């Protein structure tokens, strides 16, 4: 691709990733992933999903085994945003933080999501420094 075309493709991809965060907040995860609220609330997070997240990679679909993995996977889209303005928008709009305010009855999952929020705050701050 020429540089101009690549620029437009990256802008569209960034916008799509940001919109995916919005959709996953506005539409109940139970509806998107065809899972019961009970299954979602007791869901663990797959260790391989956490490994990919902490390596700052987008989580591959093939790694996801549990419903909570989808929220982690969507949050990991932030690592592939191309432009500083996209990162600023993600933080400002708040969809990411609302997605990560994941309601769970599983204490290990609650701890994982707290750590994920902390890591994303740290990572976003480092990107804007």
What do these predicted ranges mean?
Residues 2-129:
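Divalent metal-dependent phosphate-bond-processing catalytic cores, especially two-metal-ion Mg2+/Mn2+ enzymes
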């Amino acid at each position: 691709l020429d540089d101009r075309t690549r620029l437009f493709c990256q802008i569209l991809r960034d916008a799509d990733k940001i919109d995916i965060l919005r959709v996953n907040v506005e539409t109940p995860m139970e509806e998107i992933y065809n899972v019961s609220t009970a299954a979602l609330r007791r869901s663990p997070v797959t260790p391989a999903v956490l490994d990919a997240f902490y390596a700052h990679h987008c989580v591959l679909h093939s790694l996801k085994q549990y419903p909570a993995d989808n929220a982690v996977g969507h949050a990991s889209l932030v690592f592939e945003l191309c432009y500083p303005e996209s990162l600023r928008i993600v933080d400002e709009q708040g969809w990411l933080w609302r997605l990560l305010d994941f309601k769970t009855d599983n204490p290990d999952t609650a701890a994982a999501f707290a750590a994920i929020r902390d890591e994303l705050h740290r990572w976003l701050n480092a990107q804007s420094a």
